[in-house]
A protein has these predicted regions:
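Cytosolic juxtamembrane N-terminal segment immediately preceding the first transmembrane helix
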Residues: 1-29
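Glycine-rich segments within core transmembrane alpha-helices of 12-TM secondary carriers
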Residues: 138-163, 354-364
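Helix-breaking motifs and short loop linkers at transmembrane-helix boundaries and internal kinks
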Residues: 46, 78, 99-105, 133, ...
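Conserved MFS/SLC helix-loop-helix module at the cytosolic interface between two early adjacent transmembrane helices
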Residues: 65-101
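C-terminal ends and interior cores of transmembrane alpha-helices
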Residues: 88-101, 296-310
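Extracellular/periplasmic helix-loop-helix junction of adjacent transmembrane segments
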Residues: 35-65, 258-259
Length: 423
């Protein structure tokens, strides 16, 4: 039975795909728990809406630091080792959140959890982009992002189950304690997944890694700035919805935990299919045009969802497209950013752009929390998200087209990077 691009993958490509897919999925389960339990944290720990926004910001700042830091490390000790480390890191600090007794405790743990998640996303994206051949890279690397939807679905599914067995004051702690489970994935990665052959070849050719500032040198500066700005817009808009949508459904639309889970299920279903559509489209019309198309679609969808009067049935449909368009945008950054840099600085470049986008974009959900004190939550969410998507669209205009790029040719055309490594 033929399964499209999956049937065309080799054994190592398939194992790498599942390792990266699983890493995204299980880390997603851990990180999305926070947005789901914000109402419980407000009720049981007494945190305010602005403080809830600061929790989201702390994770994104941590992801910014962790993305670049893990990227720098992956360019030096290997993609596979860092991937394992980041998965364990996220699982551990999600578990520690179960024992928090105050807002300040949660803030610290959330920051540290973000370090691992930012690193895993960056390094996993580089690994799958290097292992898969150019003709399939867009579809396969983008499909890894669908793991995020799976992880989100698991956390949403766990919430009503945990709530039915435990009171609200304890339920959120149990949910965080379950976040230790992704650590099991590391045993699979250690046993079955090979290191990137492109990385191994580059490491043999030059054992010394270039300095951290190499991604800002020469022609890489323009790529780094444009990619980081686009990432800022995409993640800023996404985290408005991830952080505040559960609260919006329960406070503005007056849904119960069970009722809001149904709405979120449609959002998650869209997030599962969006990356598959983007990957197929980007391998045909190119990365840039695909980004611009989905940014326009998402901006229109968000405007209708949050700023226009719509009935319950329409809201369910819009939830699906909200997840689909956002999943598509997030997935496209994995192959695109990997195709901008030579192997010796690929992980640090992708780590900075993805992590920087999360960090700079962290002001967006925090701004929602501040604006929501004096404005309707939907208005605050919609205005902030639309500004973020506008920034991403402008940045996409500046990026070069990279679809189908041979990563070996990038290495051959970047002798200056190797000279930097010698200093």
């Amino acid at each position: 039975m033929k399964l499209g691009w999956y049937s065309a993958l080799t054994g190592p490509e398939r194992r790498t795909f599942w390792a990266c897919f699983g890493g995204f999925g299980l880390d997603s389960m851990d990180t999305t728990m926070y947005g789901l339990v914000i109402p419980s944290l407000i009720a049981t720990l007494g945190i305010s809406r602005p403080e809830a926004g600061y929790l989201a910001t702390a994770a994104l700042v941590g992801a910014a630091i962790g993305g670049w830091g893990a990227g720098l490390l992956a360019d030096r000790i290997g993609r596979l080792r860092v991937l394992q480390l980041t998965i364990l890191w996220v699982a551990a600090f999600t578990f520690f959140a179960a024992f928090a007794t105050s807002f300040s405790h949660l803030l610290v743990v959330r920051l540290l959890q973000g370090l691992g998640y930012g690193g895993e996303a960056a390094v996993g994206g580089v690994l799958i982009s290097e292992v898969v051949r150019p003709a399939l890279r867009g579809r396969v690397a983008a499909s890894v992002q669908s793991g995020y939807a799976l992880g989100y679905a698991i956390s949403v599914g766990l919430l009503p189950i945990v709530s039915s067995f435990f009171p609200e004051a304890i339920g959120w702690r149990v949910l965080f304690a379950l976040g230790i489970l992704p650590a099991v994935l590391v045993f699979f990665v250690r046993r079955l997944v090979p290191e990137s052959s492109i990385y191994s070849e580059a490491k043999k050719a030059s054992a010394e890694a270039p300095p951290f500032w190499a991604i800002f040198a020469g022609p890489h500066l323009r790529h780094t700035v444009a990619a980081a700005l686009m990432s800022t817009g995409i993640f800023g808009g996404a985290y408005v919805m991830i952080t505040w949508l559960p609260t919006y459904l329960r406070s503005a639309l007056h849904l119960s935990i069970t009722g809001s889970s149904g709405y979120l299920a449609m959002n998650i279903l869209g997030s599962l299919f969006g990356p598959l559509i983007y990957g197929w489209l980007s391998d045909r019309i190119g990365r840039r045009y695909s980004f611009m198309t989905f940014l326009l679609l998402q901006a229109g969808n968000v405007a209708i969802y949050l700023l226009a009067p719509v009935d319950a049935g329409t809201t369910v449909l819009l939830n699906f497209f909200l997840g689909a368009f956002q999943g598509a945008l997030a997935s496209g950054m994995l192959p695109t950013f990997a195709e901008l840099y030579p192997t010796s600085i690929r992980a640090s470049g992708q780590g900075f752009c993805l992590g920087g986008g999360r960090g700079f974009g962290s002001v967006v959900p925090a701004s929602v929390g501040i604006l929501a004190v004096n404005h309707p939550l939907g208005t605050a969410m919609g205005g902030c998200a639309l500004c973020a998507y506008a920034l991403a669209f402008v940045a996409a205009l500046v990026l070069p087209e990279t679809s189908g790029t041979d990563l070996h040719r990038i290495d051959a055309a970047a002798p200056a990077i190797q000279q930097m490594a010698g200093h």
